[in-house]
Design a protein with these regions (language model features):
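Chymotrypsin/trypsin-fold serine protease catalytic domain
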Residues: 226-230, 234-306
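C-terminal cap/linker of serine protease catalytic domains
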Residues: 332, 338-368
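Catalytic nucleophile loop of clan PA
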Residues: 308-334
């Protein structure tokens, strides 16, 4: 039985690397995976055949992988992610795990006052962010289901979705099919097992080739710390042919930000909080954090803010210049990992800064 990422499991990271003493990581599957992916055994099913038709293709410092490219594959994935299966995407043993109760926190139409710090609470204020941020579901190569968070961003193809690289694949050879996850299904605005704007399969995806590392010598926290934990997805259109951004709207994307101290808002779908590993969160509602950004430990390409989100929040957007009235801002990074601050203070959630590699991925996606 696997320990959920982010929970105390007795694992001490002794691998040399940038974050050896700073970040909590966990081993999931056969390779080390950055914390914050939510793993779960597939509900009563054996491992599935991948829905992909092509293997990995390496070009221009990125590694791309084909997704659901046929109508049959898209239909199978859509049928697979039932409301119950989505709700159980954080359970270790779905066969005996009660389906989580719905979160009935009431909506609040009033805008959140600007620059209000928040270490973790249900987002109830609506706006664009409630439509273009959602839960990204997938199946590991051994048949276990998992989930992350992802965001629709503005782009020429109107189909670009950004998340963390470790939500797409583990470190290792990009040509090895078992490093890639499968059955990708993005549900924007996910809420209590429902799909208010529908569900979207993925046509293709890519990570930086620098994310590809030797799993015998490198923890994925090392390459995350180097700023490469960014993944881009190109979503298939909705049933009527509309691109996803026409359905959900989109957030702007920015590169080379934020400045230290810049106020940033983070969103995600965690299964639990770092300080409260009980039933504080169950992945049913989108959680919000906000505060001034600060540098990550021992690397300029990780930065974060105080936030009590853990497994499931990976890939979630960190937005600068966020307008709490409209729910719009600029995505300047995605959640990569976490650190519990010293002295009993609240934990921090760290994002990978969008640098040259992230820009290359974004440009690649626009022609797909």
């Amino acid at each position: 039985m696997r320990t959920p990422p982010g929970r105390s499991h007795g694992h001490q990271d002794s691998t040399p690397g940038i974050l050896r003493h700073a970040l909590r990581v966990t081993v999931a599957m056969s390779s080390a995976v950055v914390a914050l992916v939510t793993p779960a055994a597939a509900a009563g099913t054996a491992p599935h055949e991948p829905s992909y038709t092509d293997g990995a293709v390496r070009a221009d410092a990125l590694t791309a992988y084909a997704g659901a490219t046929t109508a049959q594959a898209r239909a199978r994935i859509d049928a697979y992610w039932t409301p119950e299966r989505m709700k159980l995407a954080g359970a270790l043993v779905p066969e005996i795990t009660p389906v989580p109760e719905d979160d009935d926190t009431p909506d609040d139409p009033r805008p959140l006052p600007p620059d209000t710090p928040d270490s973790g609470s249900v987002w109830t204020h609506g706006g664009s962010v409630e439509k273009n941020v959602g839960r990204l579901f997938f199946t590991f190569s051994d048949g276990y289901d998992g989930s992350c968070t992802a965001t629709v961003v503005t782009g020429a193809n109107r189909s670009t979705v950004v998340t963390a690289a470790h939500c797409l694949r583990g470190v290792g050879s990009p040509s090895a099919d078992d490093t890639w996850n499968h059955n990708f299904y993005f549900v924007p605005g996910y809420r209590n097992g429902t799909k208010p704007l529908g569900g979207f399969t993925v046509r293709t995806m890519a990570t930086s080739s620098r994310w590809d590392a030797d799993p015998d010598t490198t923890e994925s926290s090392d390459v995350a710390a180097a700023g490469y934990d960014t993944g881009l997805l190109v979503a298939n259109p909705a049933a009527g042919g509309r691109p996803i951004a026409d359905v959900t709207g989109s957030q702007r994307i920015g590169f080379g930000r934020p400045a230290e101290g810049e106020f940033v808002h983070a969103f995600g779908y965690p299964d639990y909080g770092l300080n409260d590993p009980g039933d504080k969160y169950v992945g049913s509602r989108m959680i919000h954090c906000a505060g001034p950004s600060h540098p990550g430990p021992r690397t300029p390409l990780l930065w974060g803010e105080t936030c009590d989100m853990s497994a499931g929040s990976s890939g979630g957007p960190h937005l600068a210049g966020f307008d709490t009235r409209t729910g719009t801002g600029t995505v300047v990074g995605v959640t990569s990992t976490d650190e519990e601050l010293a002295g009993g203070q609240g934990p921090a959630l760290y994002a990978t800064r969008f640098g040259a590699d992230a820009r290359r991925l974004y440009d690649w996606a626009q022609s797909r």
